[in-house]
Amino acid sequence: MRERSRRRLLLIAASAGILAALAPGSRSIAASKASPPVDAARRLADAVVSSPELTSDTLYLCDRIGGRLTGSPACRLAVSWTRSRFEEAGLEGVRLEPFTLPRAWLPGEGEARLLAPVAMDLEIATVPYSPDTGSVLEARVFDAATGSPADIARQGKSARGAIGLVRTAEMRSLVDLFTEYMRDREMLRAAQEAGVAGLLLMSTRPRGLLYRHPIRTDGTLTPVPVALVRREHAQRIGRLLDSGDEVRVRLAIEGTAGGPIESHNVIADIPGRERPGEIVLFGAHLDSWDLGTGAEDNAVNCAAVIAVARAMKQLGLSARRTIRFALFTGEEQGLWGSLDYVRRHAAELDNHVAVVIMDIGSGRVTGYYLNGREELRGPVVRALEPVGRFGPFEHPIEAVDGTDNFDFLLSGVPNLIAAQDMTNYLPDYHAASDVFETVNGEQAAKNTAITAALLWHLAEARERPAPRQTRQEVEELIRRTGLEPQMKAFGQWDAWVSGRRGIFN
């Protein structure tokens, strides 16, 4: 990975000190124009940080609804429930916007057993968008090392009809996580070309922790069956291979992929008092993977979106511009909900002044990713002055792929992502351990207050924070920030080049 990409990824995890509390405000605002903008931002932050509903909403999403895989009954329930929460808060124009996920995927049964040279049941998790094995697959295991094309090609004809064991380093940083993501596309291509019967991926997490990563985000199935294996079990297989023994495994993955399926984004507005046609959007993804309950990723930040909307209505606040609240689904499978939003609202993108996304759990907000737009730095710095007690803040210039800002970025809309301390986020990312207990409720309230102040400034300022970019300017941003390798790894590059992603009127 190039040094620029490494620096960008490491900066995501950089943390800054945040002070312990905000004093809750005691006086409401009858109308936003009755108070100076800075005062309104402080009162909004006070209201958010002192509200118990941020925690109770997070708890409901985790415990009453659970993992919210797009297309599942739980995700449909989450859509309905969050819609009702916006309506109860008194927001206008609360609506569901449907879109089609090109291929449904729901978890099915998966079993694996080591047959030789010793017998042992293997703990596995089915990998999203893996095809089934048809019938029970019994095959010899070969050492695929890191899963690189060279590692697989090194096996020659002996890889045909065999199952490859892909070894991994233990994940300790965001760089390690992205190494895992960046590996998959070329690994699958090489496995298909070699005639490999299947792949067993060693979990990067110790102590039996399993997780789900989508290794295909373009709506297609992987070319060979793939399963994630408990790290300790995969390490045992590796040692047996190292000893020279012939290792055989039985693998069965039940078909779980279907055809296109409808899902929904949840949208609500607080209309602007002077420029209602101009929009500042605050979003988070509502869907999650299913092994855990999607607490850090991303129930806590869905609750933050609702909390800001509720506080604004309780205080009677209406900014100069409309603030739109969006809970997207289909994010985990490839950003499908936010992609549909950009396409659906293509004629309005010129009037989208800014987009702010939260998607990194409840770790401390240390600033906001500028996503390659240096001109956003000044407006963001000014916006956070009312909550400077929570600083200092740093705003990385790096551009980020992999969350719901991205199709706005590709369409030239100014976009920001909350940069957060990932120390307690990474170990549970997409894992069975991502449950309510992982959430830092006190810090989540502060994070929401910080973002509320940012939103208020962006919606209240007389001037836009930055212009919308042209396609040529976005092309230059992609080149300058080194996004191309990530876009290729996530299966987005061809769609961008062909014009299927990136909306320009």
Give the location of each predicted region.
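Extracellular/luminal Protease-associated
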Residues: 72, 123-225, 293, 391-394
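His/Asp/Glu-rich mid-to-C-terminal helical/loop segments that flank catalytic regions of hydrolases
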Residues: 226-229, 310, 426-491, 503-505
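Soluble metallo-hydrolase cores and metallopeptidase-like ectodomains found primarily
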Residues: 38-40, 120-156, 216-295, 307-310, ...
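N-terminal secretory signal peptides and thylakoid transit peptides that target proteins
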Residues: 2-16
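N-terminal hydrophobic or amphipathic helices/low-complexity stretches enriched
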Residues: 29-77, 84, 88-89, 154, ...
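Short helix-loop-beta-strand segments that form the rim/entrance of peptidase-like active sites
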Residues: 56, 221, 311-336
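Metal-dependent peptidase/peptidase-like ectodomains
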Residues: 117-121, 234, 275, 290, ...
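Noncatalytic luminal/extracellular "stalk/propeptide" segments of secretory-pathway proteins
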Residues: 37, 59, 63-163, 169-172
